[in-house]
Amino acid sequence: MTHGGEPDLALLSAETARSVAETMQALAAPSRVRILSRLGVGACSVGELARELGMAQPAVSQQLRVLRHLGLVVGERDGRQMIYGLHDDHVRSLLSEAVSHTEHLRLGLAVHPGAQLQPA
């Protein structure tokens, strides 16, 4: 697969599957999902995230460390503070698709309109 192309999902190596699973674990914590969602609107500092999300600043910092380690967010120093943002549009798309899928299920829609099972 080249960057930007469609991956061949049938041919995931064990290493790729492990890496994808680690990335998807970021979405297993509601606090991290909320942080990613907020950063999807625009970059901001730890203090801003803490205030806007109603979280303790140390908790936000801890979650940002996890998200940085997974390559989902980046930080840039601005004077005495770090400003965080999404790594790239892939992260925004991943979160958007997860939210869309969850909402789809919540509404009880069995199959997305136009969706078809793909033959093996």
Regions found by a protein language model. Give the residues of each.
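Amphipathic alpha-helical dimerization/coiled-coil segments
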Residues: 1-15, 19, 90-120
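N-terminal helix-turn-helix DNA-binding core of bacterial DNA-binding proteins
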Residues: 14, 18-58, 78, 82-91
